[in-house]
């Protein structure tokens, strides 16, 4: 394989038993392979947790060498309208499977991006071509998939991968690539990944371009992520009434890491639970963080929203000390 190959593709599982995490789901999928048949499937869960990996591995095991001819992957976020159903999906679904396959598989990724009309057309297509085609529908939020589609599928919910799963996958890759990962480097990868194996692998590949000894500093540097302790220090300054010092720390983080407003808010949210705050204080802060996050999505000033958030931390700290 080429040295510059993207690692998320290079290390994509070829078999269902190689998929990391989700053992209960992979066991069910393996049983489909053994029976030679499967229903329509709905995979729901956040990005990078193995939905596509399971779909591709399922097709590989089910079809063998003809899997490319009997399996197609479409991304619904590229074309949200009804045309993707009328053209791409129907054109593939109406042709007969090759070899000894009983049916073909259409893997529709990010299907929650489809409009309601497109989903209704998809439901009709699923019914019409059920004899020769199976659908694997992947989405981040199953609530955005219309009920008539959900009721026609076996639903599998993929949760974020835990630290053990991330460690297992990253350790395999590091060994194969001749990398040494320090403990703090692995902790940093787990922190950066947030349960997303794809993000962890991409972070490792980026770090490997500048060092073979992977430390926390290398991970945070290459992923433009602030160290958790630096975020905690900024919040502690605000809680202790040192608003201007916390503001200066914010400046330092913005310059050093080039963080976006949403990145900082996400890290603030994750770090504040490590500060030993009372539940009432946490409730008030979570409410304020949610408000700031919403305003950023609406186009508000990042700087003003984050500084307002630090000001709220200061006020909560002052109230706590009374």
Swiss-Prot record:
For this protein, the record's Pfam families field holds: AAA, AAA_lid_RFC1, Rep_fac_C
SMART domains attached to this UniProt entry:
AAA (SM00382)
Annotated Gene Ontology cellular component terms: DNA replication factor C complex
Instruction: Identify the domain of life.
Output: Archaea
Q: Which GO terms describe its molecular function?
A: ATP binding; ATP hydrolysis activity; DNA binding; DNA clamp loader activity
In the record, biological process GO terms are: DNA repair; DNA-templated DNA replication
Write out the residues that bind ATP: 45-52
- Keywords recorded for this protein, A-Z: ATP-binding, DNA replication, Nucleotide-binding
Family as reported in the entry's similarity comment: Belongs to the activator 1 small subunits family. RfcS subfamily.
What is this protein for, i.e. what is its function?
Part of the RFC clamp loader complex which loads the PCNA sliding clamp onto DNA.
Q: How does it assemble?
A: Heteromultimer composed of small subunits (RfcS) and large subunits (RfcL).
Q: What is this protein called?
A: Replication factor C small subunit
UniProt gene name: rfcS
